[in-house]
Amino acid sequence: MSFRSVIQEVKGEIGAISRRGFRSRPGRVRRVAAAAEEPPDESSAAALVMRESCWTQLPPELLREVLARVEESEGWWPRRRDVVACAGVCRSWRGIVREIVRTPEASGNLTFPISLKQPGPRDAPMKCFIVRNRTTQTYYLYIGLTDALTDDGKFLLAARKCRRTTCTEYLISLDMNDISKRTDSYVGKLRSNFLGTKFTIYDAHPPYAGDVISKGQSARVIGSNHLSPRIPAGNYPVSHISYELNVLGSRGPRRMHCAMDSIPVSAIEQGGTAPTQTEFPLSYHESFTSIPFFKSKSVRANNSTASLLTQNGSKLVLKNKSPRWHEHLQCWCLNFHGRVTVASVKNFQLVASDESNPTNQEHDDVILQFGKVGKDMFTMDYRYPISAFQAFAICLSSFDTKIACE
């Protein structure tokens, strides 16, 4: 069998598996033929075992080359699901695929769930969109499959609005059907103050090496490569968002600042790097079923986590790009390059603020932009150094009512 035939056969086998697990947008679920849902008979099951054992016993060098070719050829969704399916065959395949697949910063691709916690691409923004469901108070984040604003997209994250007595929370999950802190798909949350002017983004897992976890009087340091397998989901503040008073009310643009507690300002300088999570804690995959979640007293990051970041410099601060008044249209305008089509007070673009620019260099690159394109549809384009999770949480803050600002 030629090497090309080996690659084609691997892609065919993996493609058949991955197509059964591909998710689509709620309300547009693709119907699967009844025959595909029927359990296989004994003969087909035996044949499947034989094929799987054949592939798992390939020499490591040949297997790595085959998987590298598959990863290179399946560059974008929905074909990218074949790469994910390769990682699910067995432990050896998973290890090789994880070594081959690069981070979004380097590749511009979102492949695994951990990619949503990693910085976006440097060269071009990651183009996503958010769908709002007013009835259920839920929000769904998708990555666009094409440049069109009307494609189905690939589901990434979901959020559900929860009103509390003194605040509002948005729970963020990898599962669109079960958005709860009690599931292993919970990745973090956004919490507002009573007035809706200040928000805090909490990560469910340590955002970078050296986080201090505290509960009561005890504390311990957890490195990125030594995460305890029995750490339940906690509250690790990674960003603080504030909205300032708008004297023009709903007619004028909002003023917002985002202090990225887990990203140093050096990340946007020449040769700078941003902290990157490489994997979820072991508990995320295997131990959550046996670990009780803390409800009122969750595990929290100690205030000293901020000092761990600021030892090598201050944190990155983002601000909204000031719009210009258009005399002919009689409205405030920003150049969204065709990605926003409906005027809204929610629309914004974030750039590095002056206080994050000690060298007085111009940082006009838009790191995150968000805008309305339909009644319940919004675009979200983000890039390095923030992640999809952070960008989604920041955009969720724009949906919340601002009592003191409007």
UniProtKB/Swiss-Prot annotation:
Residue intervals of the F-box domain: 53-108
CDD domains in alphabetical order: F-box_AtTLP-like
Record InterPro entries: F-box-like_dom_sf, F-box_dom, Tubby-like_C, Tubby_C, Tubby_C_CS
Pfam families: F-box (PF00646), Tub (PF01167)
Domain of life: Eukaryota
Signal sequence, start to end: none
Tissue: Ubiquitous.
Family that this chain belongs to: Belongs to the TUB family.
Cited PANTHER family: TUBBY-LIKE F-BOX PROTEIN 11, TUBBY-RELATED
Protein name: Tubby-like F-box protein 11
Native source organism of the sequence: Oryza sativa subsp. japonica (Rice)
Taxonomic classification: Eukaryota, Viridiplantae, Streptophyta, Embryophyta, Tracheophyta
